[in-house]
Amino acid sequence: MYFPMELKHNPTGKDDIDAEREHREEILGELAESMNESTESPEGDEEKFNSEPSAELEALLPYYSQVEDEALKVAKKYFHGTFIANSQNVNGQKLFEYAHNGHTYRCYVDIYNENEREINIIEVKATTISKYIYKEINKGGKKERKGLYFTDAHGGNPYSLIIKDGNIWRFNTADSKVNDYALEKFEEKKKYLLDKYRKEGKHPYDLAFQRFVIEGALRKAGDKRPVNYYLAVLNSEYVCDGAVDENGKRVYNNVDGQEIITFIELNETTKAYQETILKEIAILESYISTPHDVSKKVDVGEYCAWGEKTECRFWRHCFQTLRGVPDTNRANNYVYCKGSFNEGKIENKYQLVNEGYWTFDDVPMDWLVKENHKIQRDCYDNGAEHVDKEKIQYWFDQLEYPIYHFDFEGFPCPLPRFKGERPYAQSVFEFSLHIEREPGICDKEKDNFIFLNEECYDDERKALAKAIIDHFEFNEDGTLKGTMLAQFTTYEKGRLEELANLYPEYSKKLLAIRDKSADLLHLLRNNKEMYEEMYKKEYENKYGKPYEDIIMEMPNDIKKKMKAEMKKAGEIINYYHKDLGGSYSIKKTLPVLVPSLTYKGMDVGNGVQAYIAYINYDSDEPTFNTLKTKAKRRDALKRYCQQDTWAMVEILKAVRRKIK
């Protein structure tokens, strides 16, 4: 977007139109969003990209260009005629200009295709088809429905909103006619694509603006050919077969009917968006022609992504009152705050801000009805430290020694790098392991093992998998001797499963590690299933019978009280300190619990920097201005990954001291 200097409100300070720069910044933003979507980490973790352009994102631009190149290759299989595309320079793309009310609107088309009968506009995005289609996943032993779908009754049969026709996804009009209920829900879900603030509606909105410009330009040119609009996205169902060309370069063949790129037809959606586009253009033009009050209060919402890594770059304008508020005192630091304040009248953290409750202590005490919020507020107001010794001790009691403090580093490459990988698969290249054989007995160097790929472009996953099982100990029955510990075990367990599927000879032991794990988040934050089970065991030990039998024998009022207490045990946080700021990422907990240990000043200081250093192994350009050689990059990666597992060792020591 272009903001001329003469305008009163020019937040970006731009004074010229630079299409290449604009396009580059747009791509960087898309990359940040797509990479963050692919990152399996708890909400608020720092292992994500900022929305601002950065050296880390710049290093990933070649991968985005590859996505555009692959999209063109696949498009040529399914569309006929001539093509105009250029992944390296936006000025080589098809340009449309449309003059409207004295203003000129421009758009470049990623892939322009035309023939005598029609024009096809293809907008390439580095995201995947996953968010748009129905899928069923297994979560904690329960099936969970994801994506865009509708049903034929309340809780009835699910149908995907869009279905595949060849390699093009279109609205599922056939199943919408099953009955009136299905048709109603089908129309409701279609509207998700018309909400630019939803993850499903953002990209259709971009394409709809292009439609406004393109069709305006074509009308003036007298071109009456029909125009079709498509998103080209990565196919999350595609599994790389490992094929390469004669030069050893990866080739993405059609594998079992799946292409690496798939298309979503959005003619109906982009047409329905035009009313919104015209209204917003009228507002934009009024801002240009008429001075307006830029200090006027603007309501904030989910679209601001406030406090997240991808927060809007203009938040300092809309959140002017928050400029001087320290992170630890932001109102959004209350955990699980949806519908939690003022008897549910305050829906979320954005409504808090819109109504003038900007800081932690702005929120009235009588609004705090949830126990967690009362704990947080007490810690903030009084400098207290919350430690639930009983629950923390229960967590320690579940551990079997030795403890394997374990951490993977992976690269979520947009295009799969090796056989068996999908788009944005976490391609693991390093792990660190600290072995704690008895409580508190672990040496940072002697009890540590690190595996790090020798090369970036070689598939070393088999050697990595073997190194894992060689450094864990197993019982005669094949089970793990001890407990694998990680921060957010979902990530480590997922990678172990993937390696087990790739290498059957190592499968049994890799899955044995997965099946005996503990999570540092469950120690410090909470875990519903674990601590509800703790509550049940206390009653079973007291009465000598199963919990279900005990509760059946209780009067209704006692039964109700017991259920409430069990729910409370599963929800209340185990540990809190005001400096956590509502986050339990290791970058927050470490300074609080082990202030002598820090990531500050490290050449590689987070997971993003880790894989950027890895993919730049052989680059002649300095990485982060200090890592000028491959040897230095490898050394920095080893020290960073070692720090992750050593931090877990030290955190356990610190927590043990607090419950003595």
Feature-to-residue mapping (PLM):
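Long, compositionally biased intrinsically disordered regions
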Residues: 367, 610-660
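Acidic beta-strand-to-loop metal/phosphate-binding motif
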Residues: 482-490
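A short acidic (Asp/Glu
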Residues: 133, 240-244, 414-419, 492-502
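Metal-dependent nuclease catalytic regions and adjoining charged, substrate-binding loops involved
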Residues: 152-204, 213-314, 322, 453-479, ...
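Metal-dependent nuclease catalytic cores that hydrolyze phosphodiester bonds in DNA/RNA
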Residues: 1-121, 127-167, 331-385, 631
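Conserved RNase H-like, two-metal-ion catalytic cores of nucleic-acid enzymes
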Residues: 68, 72-79, 121-123, 128, ...
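Cys/His-rich finger/ribbon microdomains and the adjacent scaffold used
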Residues: 13-43, 245-401, 414-416
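Two-metal-ion RNase H-like nuclease active-site motif
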Residues: 89-97, 402-412, 519
